[in-house]
C-alpha cells in the first residue's frame, strides 16, 4: 500500500511513522509513505496557500491551486482513495478501516485554517471522513489515527493475525477483559476459568464478557449486533443480577 499525506506540516508525521507497527510495516515494505508539503505548490510569490472567503466570514480558506497542483504530481489512478479529513465527514469506524485496508493507494488531504475551497471537495475527494464530533486545528492528527487503524489490518503487519480479530469493534462488540501474571495482586485475583486450560469454557467466558461489557459501556453497538438466543439469555441473566444488587 502507498500512502501520501498532503499537509502543511510534514514534520508532524515523523514521530508516528517512525515507531512501532507503522515503522515495521515500512521495514517489511508492506507500506510506502510519503509526505507532501502543498505549500511548495503555491502559485503565489509569498507561498500563500489560504485566502479570505468570498461573501465574508471568519477565518481563512485553503486555496484550490496548491492542493490540485500537488495531486497532479502524485501517481494516482481511478482506484486511489483520496480522503479529506473534515468534521463534516462520515464518522470513522472499524468497518471503514477494514475497507480501506485493501486499498492500494490512499491520499490524505490534511487541511488547516477555516476550511477548504469547495472545489477541492467536489473534484478531488473520494471519501470525507471525521474521527469525531469535535474540531481540531488540522487534519494531521486524524490522518495519523486512521493510518494506524488501517495499516494494522493489512495481512503481514501484525506478528499474530489473530490479534486484530480479538480487538474491540472487530466483530461489533467490545473486547473481553485481559489478565496476565501475577495470578493474585493485592487481593485481586484472575478469574479461575482463565486458568482452567479448558479452551471451550474460556471462549464462552470471553464471549459473555464481551456482551456484558458492550451492554454496559456501548449499548448502541448491540442494536446492530445479531444477538443469538443464547446471547439474549446471557444479557437477561446479567440484568437480573443487577436488580438483586
Curated annotation (Swiss-Prot):
EC number: 2.1.1.228
Name the UniProt record assigns to this protein: tRNA (guanine-N(1)-)-methyltransferase
Subunit description: Homodimer.
Catalytic activity entry: guanosine(37) in tRNA + S-adenosyl-L-methionine = N(1)-methylguanosine(37) in tRNA + S-adenosyl-L-homocysteine + H(+)
Gene: trmD
Keyword RNA-binding carried by entry: no
Residues that coordinate or bind S-adenosyl-L-methionine: 111, 131-136
CDD domains named in the record: TrmD-like (cd18080)
Protein family (similarity comment): Belongs to the RNA methyltransferase TrmD family.
A Pfam match: tRNA_m1G_MT
UniProt xrefs under SUPFAM superfamilies: alpha/beta knot (SSF75217)
GO cellular component: cytosol
InterPro entries: Alpha/beta_knot_MTases (IPR029028), tRNA_m1G_MeTrfase_C_sf (IPR023148), tRNA_m1G_MeTrfase_TrmD (IPR002649), tRNA_m1G_MTases_N (IPR029026), tRNA_MeTrfase_TRMD/TRM10 (IPR016009)
Entry keywords, A to Z: Cytoplasm, Methyltransferase, S-adenosyl-L-methionine, Transferase, tRNA processing
GO BP term, pick one: tRNA N1-guanine methylation
Leader sequence segment: none
Function per UniProt: Specifically methylates guanosine-37 in various tRNAs.
Amino acid at each position: 500500500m502507498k500512502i501520501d499525506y498532503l499537509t502543511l506540516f510534514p514534520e508532524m508525521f515523523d514521530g508516528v511513522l517512525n515507531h512501532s507497527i507503522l515503522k515495521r510495516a515500512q521495514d517489511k515494505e508492506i507500506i510506502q509513505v510519503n509526505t507532501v508539503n502543498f505549500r511548495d505548490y503555491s502559485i503565489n510569490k509569498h507561498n500563500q496557500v489560504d485566502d479570505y472567503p468570498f461573501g465574508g466570514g471568519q477565518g481563512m480558506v485553503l486555496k484550490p491551486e496548491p492542493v490540485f497542483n500537488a495531486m497532479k504530481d502524485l501517481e494516482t489512478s481511478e482506484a486511489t482513495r483520496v480522503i479529506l479529513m473534515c468534521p463534516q465527514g462520515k464518522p470513522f469506524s472499524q468497518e471503514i478501516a477494514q475497507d480501506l485496508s485493501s486499498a492500494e493507494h490512499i491520499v490524505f488531504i490534511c487541511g488547516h485554517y477555516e476550511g477548504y475551497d469547495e472545489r477541492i471537495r467536489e473534484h478531488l475527494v473520494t471519501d470525507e471522513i471525521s474521527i469525531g464530533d469535535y474540531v481540531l486545528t488540522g487534519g494531521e492528527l486524524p490522518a495519523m489515527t486512521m493510518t494506524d487503524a488501517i495499516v494494522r489490518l493489512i495481512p503481514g503487519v501484525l506478528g499474530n493475525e489473530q490479534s486484530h480479530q480479538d480487538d474491540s469493534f472487530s466483530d461489533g462488540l467490545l473486547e473481553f477483559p485481559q489478565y496476565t501474571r501475577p495470578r493474585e495482586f493485592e487481593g485481586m485475583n484472575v478469574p479461575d476459568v482463565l486458568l482452567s486450560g479448558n479452551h471451550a469454557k474460556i471462549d464462552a467466558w470471553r464471549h459473555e464478557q464481551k456482551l456484558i461489557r458492550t451492554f454496559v459501556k456501548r449499548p448502541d453497538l448491540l442494536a446492530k449486533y445479531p444477538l443469538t438466543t443464547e446471547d439474549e439469555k446471557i444479557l437477561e441473566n446479567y440484568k437480573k443480577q443487577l436488580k438483586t444488587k
